[in-house]
């Protein structure tokens, strides 16, 4: 069937910012789809609000709009561009919901835009719980006993019929937003209220819990001629009841009999045929472990997180082929790009095992609610490939970067068995490691199965891993046992611990006895057809399939799983670095382990090694490939942390030298440099004991910022105002010691400024300077950044330019450098220098059209910036105003305080651009999910130190027509300043403010921290109530000021004559 010739221009909707439940997998899918449509000769227009993606690069689509993903903005683009068609199934839930809104409002019809891919009626049939259930009944496919509710009362009526436990699933949401498992009336009321709030259709499905069934997924493709195939099937190790995005997953499934596999395969294909899916689709099923009974849980009629995993697990490019199916091509006429010889209608076959483990943000949010359920909490994931289940699991564990290298916890032996069992029953993010610990203590597999319902197949594999540990201990230094442990994925580090040797000794022993990994190709067909994909995984077997060429090579280390503080921005830089290496005539090799990203698409680099980012795994690749060198500055802290160990082993670190990377991090050396080049920094000291920290703080004068050295994303960083708070910090957050010094700095209040620069050793170019809206003290990743600066004087800009140039040259930077400054009342101070790519690189690259990561890579390979046509210093400004606004995922993380501070909390970002600051901010705030209204009610409750400043904001909000509610102290202050205000009761009193928030009477909350960070504090409850009821809550008066500017610019002031 030839492609659709009636259309020329296609609008693609992206998925917007990275949030929990919708991460980098959509950048990967969108990039693939846009390129596939261009390959077929269509003109592609892309709209997405996320500047950190490869997808929003000008090369990917013919026209790129970085605008808010709201009905109004997309409708404007449709009216302006007049596309022939819209492809909505590649932008996650956001893209789907937008398509439905644009259709319902008549925008598509009135502009003659047709929807490509799966028809809207099919999308609604899959997403609307009522329609889906009735279709399943017609097909005679069992669904769990359930009811559709639009009110809490209806939910209680259903509970009377079936009893607890119940699962609540809101319609048209993703990542299980607003859903959950309920065991009692209190939970049912809370979850249903939440779920109805988050569902665009105010509709929830309530079903009898089938927790404990096996959860199986099929990733399927269908075209318009009804050809349908299964690309990959996957099994969740955790039974039904934990969101698949939070489950440990294995592919292909390991515990199904052939009869069960075929039965569920047939059901999956029957369902997508009945729905009329055209493209990729994910089907989730529950199978009773004790019979052939099964239920269908849900169908995602779009490309999803699971399809990114299936693509990387098989090499079969689902999003690319889904885009081509959408324009009318069929599976039997498209070649599989991996083999180049077989057609896309052949189902992939795997001769290896894939393990996926989610990456959770609880290293950042220690007080967060860790228990897992149907609402997703992971920010990212890792994948590993092995020849046995044990090998792939252990490789995935050491890819997580939790400081865990094996099936157990770092200080596992210190826990007593009762505590371990309690944690296993709790089913949280560390359960897997506690299971390992329990087996180590001799707990029977029967007892663990009883507690977890995890299949014996997997429990036996865990037991096998523990058995190998015992064998190693009993046969220290034995080569046969060493080889056996390597076959099952043990790292040298773990073997060393059992052998009572150092890691280097085990490494040496291995090499002397020629025990080293070979690299196998991922070819989609288990070697049934000829294939030549440059996509490899390491394993301890015989034949090496990775042919080493005689071209000069450069290895780029990726940034691993998406987490808070290290997002898709680093993947963006990695991909650009690879393109620059290829353009310079070298062979570019990527090592990474994140299945969601563009960098792990095998068509990007000359070779892709899907391996853990550890010294051992990376060294094995270096030993084989013998590269010119390794690039670490694009992979975030993950790659930087490997630099020292690699250099010790004689590896050439390309770009800024290891010595200079360390100079930027080492307190004393950095201070010496600043004195030499005459750049001021806030007074600070290093403490190696709690006593010394107190002494330092008193000498410098409070408030001080305290933090451990060598961290990314401001982990464990705090501003403290007195001895008691400092003592508390040192006891709870960081044990200060000679190995782990704590930095104590004077906290300067002032405007924070961020600068990115590129240096080739001689010339320093500064693509742009960004000014933060929130004053210093809020982490740069959580601040709203503005380009070009709006309030800096010419003199300030000259100083920033001069300091940046001095720092880049003083540190002998080759490549990128990111610097944060504070402009205090008495001048500019340097706060922090990062000698690597930063999270603002994609944002600045897009604004200025300076391909920063590529230029940095060219400088690293020895080219001169002056030869490339760049003048030194600050580059000319781009016209317009651009803001980068943070996006948070607090609605998915219970018990997490949303107050902004030095520790980063946002999961993603959006960009707003326009001709004035107010318009750009309006777009940035809108894109980040803050609905800016020109009237409404604002609730203000601030700490004493903020009251004077708050009066000014309240006065302006009142003048544009906002009604003001405030708690007693704040209300008194406002009344004293003649501002109309209504006093609301404190929490727990009559007419309390939480009730006002829950009843939807409040549109904005302004709440600043009162010291004494106990969770019970009222402020915490106010902030959480805001998040859980979808009300924007501003915890910084700077943000409140900016929002007030925007509201003023939208409305007219009303003043009497």
Swiss-Prot record:
Report the residue ranges that make up the ATP-grasp domain in this protein: 133-327, 671-861
**E.C. numbers:** 6.3.4.16, 6.3.5.5
- Positions with a binding annotation for ATP 1: 129, 169, 175-176, 208, 210, 215, 241-243, 284, 298
- List the PROSITE patterns: ATP_GRASP, CPSASE_1, CPSASE_2, MGS
Residues that hold ATP 2 according to the record: 707, 746, 748, 752, 777-780, 820, 832
Location of region: Allosteric domain: 930-1057
Which residues take part in binding Mn(2+) 4? 832, 834
Query: Where along this sequence does the record place binding of Mn(2+) 1?
Result: 284, 298
Which GO BP terms sit in this record?
A: 'de novo' UMP biosynthetic process; glutamine metabolic process; L-arginine biosynthetic process
**Signal peptide as annotated in the record:** none
Top-level lineage group: Bacteria
Cite the SMART domains for this sequence: CPSase_L_D3, GARS_A, MGS
Cofactor(s), by name: Mg(2+); Mn(2+)
To which pathway does this protein belong? Amino-acid biosynthesis; L-arginine biosynthesis; carbamoyl phosphate from bicarbonate: step 1/1; Pyrimidine metabolism; UMP biosynthesis via de novo pathway; (S)-dihydroorotate from bicarbonate: step 1/3
Query: Domain annotation text?
Result: The large subunit is composed of 2 ATP-grasp domains that are involved in binding the 2 ATP molecules needed for carbamoyl phosphate synthesis. The N-terminal ATP-grasp domain (referred to as the carboxyphosphate synthetic component) catalyzes the ATP-dependent phosphorylation of hydrogencarbonate to carboxyphosphate and the subsequent nucleophilic attack by ammonia to form a carbamate intermediate.
State how it assembles: Composed of two chains; the small (or glutamine) chain promotes the hydrolysis of glutamine to ammonia, which is used by the large (or ammonia) chain to synthesize carbamoyl phosphate. Tetramer of heterodimers (alpha,beta)4.
Extract the NCBIfam families matched here. CPSaseII_lrg, PRK05294.1, PRK12815.1
Identification of the protein by name:
Carbamoyl phosphate synthase large chain
Query: What is the organism field in this record?
Result: Staphylococcus carnosus (strain TM300)
Protein encoded by which gene: carB
């Amino acid at each position: 069937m030839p492609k659709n010739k009636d259309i020329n221009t296609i609008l693609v909707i992206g998925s917007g910012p990275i949030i929990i439940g919708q991460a980098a997998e959509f950048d990967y899918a969108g990039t693939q789809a846009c390129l596939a449509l261009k390959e077929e000769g269509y003109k592609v227009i892309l709209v997405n609000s996320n500047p950190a993606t490869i997808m929003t690069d000008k090369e990917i689509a013919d026209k790129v709009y970085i605008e808010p993903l709201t009905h109004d903005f997309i409708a404007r683009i449709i009216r302006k561009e007049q596309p022939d068609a819209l492809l909505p199934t590649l932008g996650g839930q956001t893209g789907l919901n937008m398509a439905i809104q644009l259709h319902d409002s008549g925008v598509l019809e009135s502009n003659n835009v047709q929807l490509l891919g799966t028809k809207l009626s099919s999308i609604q049939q899959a997403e609307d719980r009522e329609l889906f259930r009735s279709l399943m009944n017609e097909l005679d496919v069992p669904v769990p006993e359930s009811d559709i509710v639009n009110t809490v009362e209806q939910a209680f009526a259903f509970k009377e019929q079936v009893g607890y436990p119940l699962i609540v699933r809101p319609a048209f949401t993703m990542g299980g937003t607003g859903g959950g498992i309920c065991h009692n009336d209190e939970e049912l009321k809370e979850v249903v209220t939440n779920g109805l709030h988050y569902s665009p259709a105010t509709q929830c499905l309530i079903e009898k819990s089938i927790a404990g069934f096996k959860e199986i997924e099929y990733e399927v493709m269908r075209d318009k001629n009804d050809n349908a195939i299964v690309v990959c099937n996957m099994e969740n190790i955790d039974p039904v009841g934990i969101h698949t995005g939070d489950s440990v997953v294995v592919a292909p499934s390991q515990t199904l009999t052939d009869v069960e596999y075929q039965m569920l395969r047939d059901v999956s294909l029957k369902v997508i045929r009945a729905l009329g899916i055209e493209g990729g689709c994910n089907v989730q099923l529950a199978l009773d472990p004790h019979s052939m009974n099964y239920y269908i849980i849900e169908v995602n009629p779009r490309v999803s997180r699971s399809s990114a995993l299936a693509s990387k697990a098989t090499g079969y490019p689902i999003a690319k082929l889904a885009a081509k199916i959408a324009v009318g091509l069929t599976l039997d006429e498209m070649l599989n790009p991996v083999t180049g010889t077989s057609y896309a209608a052949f189902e992939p076959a795997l001769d290896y095992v894939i393990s996926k483990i989610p990456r959770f943000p609880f290293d950042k949010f220690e007080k967060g609610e860790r228990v897992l359920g149907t609402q997703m909490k992971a920010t990212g994931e890792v994948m590993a490939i092995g020849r046995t289940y044990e090998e792939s699991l252990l490789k995935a564990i050491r890819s997580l970067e939790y400081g865990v290298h094996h099936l157990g916890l770092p200080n596992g032996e210190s826990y007593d068995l009762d505590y371990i069992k309690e944690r296993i029953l709790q089913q949280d993010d560390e359960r897997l490691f506690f299971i390992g610990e329990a087996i180590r203590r001799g707990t029977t597999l029967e007892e663990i199965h009883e507690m977890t319902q995890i299949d014996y197949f997997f429990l036996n594999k865990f037991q096998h891993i523990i058995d190998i540990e015992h064998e190693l201990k009993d046969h220290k230094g034995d080569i046969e046992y060493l080889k056996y442990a390597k076959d099952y994925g043990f790292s040298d580090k773990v073997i060393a611990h059992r052998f009572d040797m150092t890691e280097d000794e085990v490494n040496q022993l291995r090499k002397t006895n020629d025990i080293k990994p070979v690299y196998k190709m991922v070819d989609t067909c288990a070697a049934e057809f000829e294939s030549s994909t440059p996509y490899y995984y390491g394993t301890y077997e015989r034949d090496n399939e990775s042919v080493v060429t005689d071209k000069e090579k450069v290895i780029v280390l990726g940034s691993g799983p998406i987490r808070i503080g290290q997002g898709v921005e680093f993947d963006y830089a990695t991909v650009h670095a690879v393109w620059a290496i290829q353009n310079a005539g070298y062979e570019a090799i990527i090592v990474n382990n994140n299945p969601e990203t563009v960098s792990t698409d095998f068509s990007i680099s000359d070779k892709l090694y899907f391996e853990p980012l550890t010294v051992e795994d990376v060294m094995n690749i270096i030993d084989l490939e013998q590269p010119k060198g390794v690039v670490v500055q694009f992979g975030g802290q993950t790659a930087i942390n490997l630099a020292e160990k690699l250099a010790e082993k004689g590896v050439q670190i390309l770009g800024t030298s290891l010595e200079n990377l360390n100079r930027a991090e080492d307190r004393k050396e950095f201070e010496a440099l600043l004195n030499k080049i005459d750049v001021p920094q806030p007074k600070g000291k290093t403490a190696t004991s709690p006593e010394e920290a107190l002494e330092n703080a008193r000498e410098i004068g409070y408030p001080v910022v305290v933090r451990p050295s060598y961290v990314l994303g401001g982990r464990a960083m705090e501003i403290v105002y007195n001895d008691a708070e400092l003592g508390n910090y040192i006891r709870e957050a960081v044990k200060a010691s000679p190995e782990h010094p704590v930095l104590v700095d004077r906290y300067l209040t002032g405007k924070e400024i961020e600068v990115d620069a590129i240096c080739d050793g001689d010339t320093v170019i500064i693509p742009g300077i960004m000014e933060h809206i929130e004053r210093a003290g809020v982490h740069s990743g959580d601040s709203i950044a503005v380009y070009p600066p709006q309030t800096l004087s010419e003199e300030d800009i000259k100083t920033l330019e001069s300091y940046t140039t001095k720092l880049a040259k003083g540190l002998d930077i080759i490549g990128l450098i990111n610097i944060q400054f504070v402009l205090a009342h008495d001048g500019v101070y340097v706060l922090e220098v990062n000698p690597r790519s930063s999270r603002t690189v994609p944002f600045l690259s897009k604004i200025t059209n300076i391909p920063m990561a590529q230029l940095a890579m060219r400088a690293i390979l020895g080219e001169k910036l002056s030869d490339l046509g760049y003048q030194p210093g600050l580059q000319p400004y781009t016209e317009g105003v651009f803001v980068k606004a943070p996006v948070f995922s607090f609605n998915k993380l219970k018990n997490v305080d949303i107050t902004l501070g030095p520790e980063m909390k946002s999961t993603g970002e959006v960009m707003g651009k326009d001709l004035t600051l107010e318009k750009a901010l309006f777009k940035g705030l809108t894109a980040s999910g803050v609905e800016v209204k020109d009237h409404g009610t604002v609730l203000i409750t601030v700490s004493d130190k903020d009251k004077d400043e708050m009066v000014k904001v309240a006065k302006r909000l009142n003048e544009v027509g906002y009604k003001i509610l405030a708690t007693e102290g704040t209300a008194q202050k406002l009344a004293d300043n003649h501002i109309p205000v209504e006093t609301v009761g404190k929490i727990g009193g009559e007419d309390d403010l939480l009730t006002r928030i829950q009843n939807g009477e409040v549109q904005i909350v302004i709440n600043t921290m009162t010291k004494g960070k106990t969770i019970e504090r009222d402020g915490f409850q106010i902030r959480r109530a805001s998040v859980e009821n979808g009300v924007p809550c501003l915890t910084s008066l700077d943000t409140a000021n900016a929002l007030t500017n925007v509201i003023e610019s939208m409305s007219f002031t009303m003043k009497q004559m």
